[in-house]
A protein has these predicted regions:
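Gram-negative outer-membrane beta-barrel transporters
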Residues: 567, 675-815
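Extracytoplasmic beta-strand/coil segments of soluble accessory domains associated
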Residues: 85-129
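Short loop/turn motifs that connect adjacent beta-strands in outer-membrane beta-barrel proteins
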Residues: 40, 150, 185-188, 201, ...
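Surface-exposed, low-complexity loop segments enriched in small/polar and acidic residues
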Residues: 138, 233, 237-246, 276-312, ...
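Short acidic/polar hinge/loop motifs at secondary-structure boundaries
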Residues: 128-162
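C-terminal beta-signal and adjacent terminal beta-strands/loops
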Residues: 429-431, 756-757, 805-819, 846-901
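N-terminal Sec signal peptide and the immediately downstream disordered periplasmic leader
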Residues: 2-88, 209, 213, 327, ...
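N-terminal periplasmic accessory domains that precede
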Residues: 80-83, 111-112, 141, 145-148, ...
Length: 901
């Protein structure tokens, strides 16, 4: 008896429509071989979302989408992020290296089903868990990095359970499951070469992949490797933002807080010059208010130094083997390793948030008294200083599967590790202050030395440093260092389950699955010694983290084929975290009913439980965000320091889905599902903007320069909390129609998701209707109401082509008002509307091997993404676009040659 995994008939329709794609030139041969395989192997069939075997005509009671390798190729996907970004059910994923909202995770990618968070979707590889990345997002969420999962050439298909699956898979499957399944029993060799070129800057991408497999009488070995090299795209190559959106009040030249008798501390623009050195004067009082001086700030354009696309190199390897023994036991093992390196652009130096004092005796001080410096060590005229990430992932998984007279069993072990290092340069607080006092330099002893004498030098923060009094590299090096965060995430999973028939019903045998699982997740984050002492002026620092979490689980599933038309699925899972978190029991009920041969109904309801992670309870981090200061009435680039919270409670949720499938005639299908997720005690990072809005003069939460009540905001202190609730609902619609004509086969497809509700209860912002909003001022994510993909595919013999039109609806930006001004105290005429966005992709491929009758297969593919080079809708914020929704790259053209031996 053989064991295999396949997609259901319903999911097969979704496979093409989900990505608005259909078959390429060589798809018919794949179709034929799949049909033959189905005829041979029908005894045991599994689909993602179930642990019991299914009959050949089974239709999943849960909404299940399957994207096969043909569909993946048809959109020109170079990596997994290219696939998930086109999914209409994916909202708010972090797949762009945006330094302002994704500070330390450049080079990674993730999935965010339904906008419920990148940690709420369980990502599997061949039905087994993968380790989460050791470096969390800005929101403190550790996620599975899909960039490190497996070479694209090894993927056979991606299966998505869209209604939540915690009752079967555990707490991480709150929003659903995405299961990447590799090719099995591959025999042969394949090499692919990809080249992609962007319309802006020097943004290019080269990918080389190889696949090899060999089969014997009882087993198979397969190996895959991929290498990716991507050049960067800087904001200066394609400026989408307005100048003021990427301008900081802390520049160099900078400003100085001077105590004015009877007035208090006022910011004074560098008297030696601002605009002359590339700065932008921002006057806060009319010229002449203070004779000879200008009240205000010297703005600095930091945006041009940052990158939309990081410079990246990736190596990903995967090896699998399976062997079938004579006693119907099959052994499988797989090993994967990934090495990712990324470098994203950064400003010459960060703002200095500690208000250091320039003494009255400083040789360049024109004020005659001590003043507080409000700026940065290096600004205009200097090169950018990038941040670097290094991510190394290792995964080993092995299992034994056995077949019995009435079912099968499986035992498995998985071990996966992610080592992640993030490095970013910053200024040291004490050393910078010493340099302003004249004790700068690594050889200077501030106890025995004299200011500005011998090895002791002054650092000159004034604009005379650009001309008559430049700074030496010796003094600059003495107060600059790199913050190094070395993190490690470790996952171990032991699992065993069995599935067997229990009794016969009208539609076949009822089947029962029972299983147990033990998993342990360890996380350690080692900050460098300087960070442990909070030595940096902007990124500050944090203590080290070292913690673990282990979970015992037992689960069961009962499949009841009541009759030929009615199937019922009952599932329940018990998980015990121990300690303060405790345990949970989460059930699921799912039903499918075939009313007629053409029309079927389905529905499901389930509960979920997500425990606080090690990082959320014990961790902490400092991130960089652009915030709107209601006191100053201006935007500011601010350090947000978040501390862990050991008092967090687990979050709980209930999800339900109802839908139907309608096939009025052959090759035409309509799928519609209504879904709803409702959370209580949602674990979130406090929204920094909401903290600032609710307590702008709270000195414990809001740190300001100069006057602690009215000075410019420098730092926000927040934590992780349990929000009151979140409820989101919507409709998924999929349709596909295959037409056979004399000119070839044409297949139009439509896939859409409409969000009807995204209601939030924010601890600071209160109740929010978040559907159709950016949700900048609350805990939510950007939620355009409608995403839609429209496609048309054509195939004729050795030729194939497809065109996709992708639409994202407009939505409100609650950070800005309709007139483009910042939302300080409310917008009388409503929020600024982010325009809807339409892009067109196209692809053509030809089977050169068939054309020239060669023994090998040579498939040439050419295509374009965003063919008309549409700019992403403008957003009045850092970088000028919404990195959670839109792609900043513009038109991308690509070519691929695939050779199979």
């Amino acid at each position: 008896m053989k064991f295999n995994t396949r997609k259901t008939a319903v999911a097969a329709f979704v496979s093409s429509a989900l990505l608005c794609s259909t078959f390429s030139a060589f798809a018919q041969e794949a179709e034929d071989s799949q049909e033959e395989a189905k005829k041979r192997d029908v005894e045991l069939i599994l689909v993602t979302g179930s642990f019991v075997r299914r009959s050949e005509n089974f239709e999943s009671p849960s909404p299940l989408a399957v994207v096969d390798s043909v569909a993946i190729d048809s959109i020109g996907a170079k990596n997994i992020a290219d696939i998930t970004q086109t999914l209409t059910i994916n909202t708010g994923a972090e797949n762009n290296p945006d330094a302002f909202t994704q500070n330390a995770t450049a080079g990674t990618s993730n999935i965010n089903l339904r906008g419920l968070g990148v940690a709420s979707t369980l990502v599997l590889l061949n039905n087994k868990r993968q380790v989460v990345t050791a470096q969390p997002t800005n929101q403190g969420l550790n996620f599975v990095d899909t960039s490190s999962l497996v070479p694209m050439i090894a993927i056979d298909r991606m299966e998505v359970v869209k209604d939540g699956a915690s009752a079967l898979y555990g707490s991480d499957a709150v929003a659903g499951v995405v299961n990447f399944i590799t090719k099995r029993n591959y025999d042969g060799a394949m090499v692919t070469v990809d080249y992609q070129d962007g319309a802006h800057g020097d943004n290019k991408e080269y990918i080389l992949q190889g696949l090899w497999g060999a089969s014997g009488d009882n087993g198979n070995v397969m190996a895959a490797i991929s290498y990716t090299n991507r050049s960067p795209l800087f904001l200066s190559d394609r400026r989408l933002s307005r100048p003021q959106d990427d301008t900081s009040a802390l520049g160099n030249p900078g400003s100085y807080f001077l105590n004015i008798p009877g007035v208090g501390a006022l910011p004074i623009i560098d008297p030696y010059g601002c605009e002359e050195q590339g700065g932008t004067p921002d006057l806060r009082a009319p010229s002449g208010t203070i004779p000879g001086l200008e009240v205000g700030f010297c703005g600095f354009d930091f945006g041009k130094f940052y990158s939309y696309v990081a410079e990246e190199s990736r190596i990903n390897t995967y090896v699998s083997a399976n062997y079938e023994f004579d006693n119907d036991i099959t052994w499988t093992a797989e090993i994967g390793m990934a090495r990712n390196r990324a470098e994203r652009g950064g400003a010459p130096s960060f703002p200095i948030l500690t208000s250091p004092i320039v003494p009255d005796y400083h040789p360049q001080n024109p004020f005659g008294t001590g003043v507080a410096f409000f700026g940065r060590a290096e600004g205009n005229g200097f090169d950018g200083d990038p941040a670097n990430t290094e991510s190394d992932t290792f995964r080993f998984s092995t299992n034994l599967q056995g077949v019995t007279d009435s079912g099968f069993w499986e035992v498995s072990y998985t071990r996966a590790v992610n080592d992640f290092m993030f490095q970013v340069p910053d200024v040291l607080n004490t050393e910078f202050q010493l340099a302003l006092l004249g004790f700068g330099g690594s050889d200077c002893n501030p106890v025995t030395g004299s200011p500005g004498t011998g090895p002791c030098e002054f650092f000159n923060p004034f604009s005379t440093s650009y001309s008559s009094a430049p700074n030496s590299q010796y003094v600059v090096d003495s107060f600059t260092a790199k913050q190094v965060i070395d993190s490690k995430s470790d996952l171990e999973v032991f699992e065993a389950f069995t599935s067997f028939d229990v009794f016969e019903m009208g539609g076949g045998f009822a089947a029962l699955a029972l299983g147990v699982q033990y998993r342990e997740q360890q996380l350690s984050i080692d900050y460098d010694p300087l960070s442990n002492q909070d030595s940096f002026t902007f990124v500050i620092g944090n203590p080290d983290i070292d913690g673990s979490q282990d979970v015992w689980a037992a689960f069961g599933e009962l499949a009841l084929p009541i009759n030929d038309d009615l199937d019922v699925q009952l599932a329940v899972r018990y998980e015990d975290y121990g300690g303060a978190i405790g345990s949970t029991v989460d059930p699921k009920l799912a039903v499918s009913y075939r009313a007629t041969d053409e029309f079927s109904l389905r529905g499901s309801i389930s509960t979920s439980f997500r425990a606080p992670t090690v990082f959320l309870a014990e961790g902490g981090a400092t991130t960089l965000q652009q915030l709107l200061d209601p006191v100053q009435g201006a935007v500011a680039f601010v350090a947000v320091r978040t501390s862990g919270n050991e008092d967090l409670k687990p979050e709980e949720s209930t999800a339900y889905n109802v839908g139907f499938s309608y096939e009025p005639f052959r090759d035409f299908s309509i799928e519609l599902d209504y879904w709803n997720f409702e959370f209580e005690d949602l674990i979130i990072q406090e929204n920094a903007q909401a903290v600032l809005n609710s307590g702008p003069t709270d000195p414990d939460r809001v740190i300001r320069a100069g006057d602690p009540l009215t000075g410019p905001v420098l730092q926000i202190n927040n934590t992780y909390v349990n929000a009151s609730s979140l409820e989101t609902s919507g409709v998924d619609f999929v349709t596909s129609y295959k037409m056979e004509t004399e000119l070839g086969n044409f297949t139009p497809t439509l896939n859409a998701t409409y969000i009807t509700k995204y209601d939030l209860s924010d601890p600071q912002a209160g109740s929010i209707d978040g559907a159709g909003r950016r949700n900048f001022n609350n805990i939510g994510t950007s939620s355009p109401e409608l995403r839609m993909n429209l496609g048309l595919a054509w195939r004729n013999d050795i030729h194939a082509a497809n065109v996709f039109v992708r639409y994202i609806s407009s939505y409100d930006d609650d950070q800005n008002c309709a007139d483009g001004t910042a939302n300080v105290t409310g917008c009388a005429n409503g929020f600024y509307e982010v325009d809807n966005h339409v892009t067109v992709d196209a692809q053509y491929n030809i089977d050169l091997g068939a054309m020239f009758d060669t023994q090998q297969s040579y498939v040439l593919t050419v295509g374009g993404i965003n063919l008309f080079d549409r700019d992403p809708p403008r957003l009045f914020t850092n970088s000028g676009f919404d990195s959670k929704v839109h792609d900043p790259r513009g038109r991308q053209v690509y070519a691929r040659l695939a050779v199979e031996f």
